[in-house]
From Swiss-Prot:
GO terms for MF: 5-oxoprolinase (ATP-hydrolyzing) activity; ATP binding
Keywords, alphabetical: ATP-binding, Hydrolase, Nucleotide-binding
Family membership noted in the UniProt record: Belongs to the LamB/PxpA family.
SUBUNIT field: Forms a complex composed of PxpA, PxpB and PxpC.
Species of provenance: Clostridioides difficile (strain 630) (Peptoclostridium difficile)
EC number: 3.5.2.9
CDD domains: LamB_YcsF_like
Its biological purpose: Catalyzes the cleavage of 5-oxoproline to form L-glutamate coupled to the hydrolysis of ATP to ADP and inorganic phosphate.
Catalyzed reactions per annotation: 5-oxo-L-proline + ATP + 2 H2O = L-glutamate + ADP + phosphate + H(+)
NCBIfam families associated with the record: PRK05406.1-3 (NF003814), PRK05406.1-5 (NF003816)
One Pfam family linked to the record: LamB_YcsF
Keyword check for Acyltransferase: no
Stated name of the protein: 5-oxoprolinase subunit A
Length: 263
């Protein structure tokens, strides 16, 4: 039996602006990445999303990003390692308060948008994020792109980590996500996307945008829940996983890694 986590970015509404179908997607995932007020979200929605996750038995993770509501955290910003560390601690700490007051723990941290993509390649930013998590609670899991600087930094300091793959995104030959601006970067065909996910979980490989086959490790799969079609996609993944004997469970129930248990 294969095991894999299904995660989704949630709690991204703020004020009177509603983003995503959180109540629906929470029925099908095992881990929630909750926005912490920088790129999206606000205190009221953080509280509500934590409560919804708890109600559905979904584990909670912090989803820190750049302080960029207008750009939804998808625009690159030039920051130092210390700033990356401070931003992560600040947002993680905020969500920890909501989690603790609702009788929950923080399972993981997954950076958002441009911060995620930059830290995948920038060792300094990656180390800042990992050090922040380790100093707050070394048992929290970093969720990051396979073979990225985030994962390498986690290994270096002994932070627990899990490798994330994306159901609907294309990869380049180095294992990084193809920018959304490139044609073919987002996979719209449901069957093709699910076939790719099953292959990543069971075979540990993925075909890149140029047709090359590369190695990949899938501990967790990112799925979206921001529109009705996305919800149907998540449902189809769950159905296919049952046929393929793939069990969906949260990261804490999967053998995640640290530098201490890497052979």
């Amino acid at each position: 039996m294969y095991k894999v986590d299904l995660n989704s970015d949630l709690g991204e509404s703020f004020g009177t602006y509603k983003i995503g179908l959180d109540e629906e997607v929470l029925k099908y995932i095992s881990s929630a990445n909750i926005a912490c007020g920088f790129h999206a979200g606000d205190p009221s929605h953080m509280e509500k999303t934590v409560q919804l996750a708890k109600k559905n038995g979904v584990k909670i993770g912090a989803h820190p990003g750049f302080l960029d509501l207008i750009g939804f955290g998808r625009r690159e910003m030039k920051i130092t390692k210390q700033e990356a560390k401070d931003y992560t601690k600040y947002q993680l700490g905020a969500l920890m308060a909501f989690a603790s007051s609702n009788g929950c723990n923080i399972q993981h941290v997954k950076p958002h948008g441009a911060l995620y993509n930059m830290a995948a390649k920038d060792k300094e930013l990656a180390m800042g994020i990992c050090e922040a998590i380790y100093e707050v609670d070394k048992d929290i899991i970093l969720l990051g792109l396979y073979n990225s600087e985030m994962i390498n930094s986690a290994k270096e300091i002994g932070l627990r980590f899990a490798n994330e793959v994306f159901a609907d995104r294309a990869y380049d030959n180095n294992g990084f996500l193809v920018p959304r601006s490139v044609e073919g970067a987002v996979i719209h065909d449901t069957k093709h996307a699910i076939d790719r996910v099953v292959r990543m979980v069971k075979e540990g490989t993925v075909e890149t945008l140029t047709g090359e086959v590369i190695h990949i490790k899938a501990d967790s799969i990112c799925v979206h829940g921001d529109n009705p079609k996305a919800i149907e996609f998540v449902k189809e993944i769950r159905k296919r996983f049952e046929l393929e004997s793939i069990e969906v469970c949260p990261l804490e129930n999967i053998e995640v890694c640290s530098s201490e248990n890497i052979v």
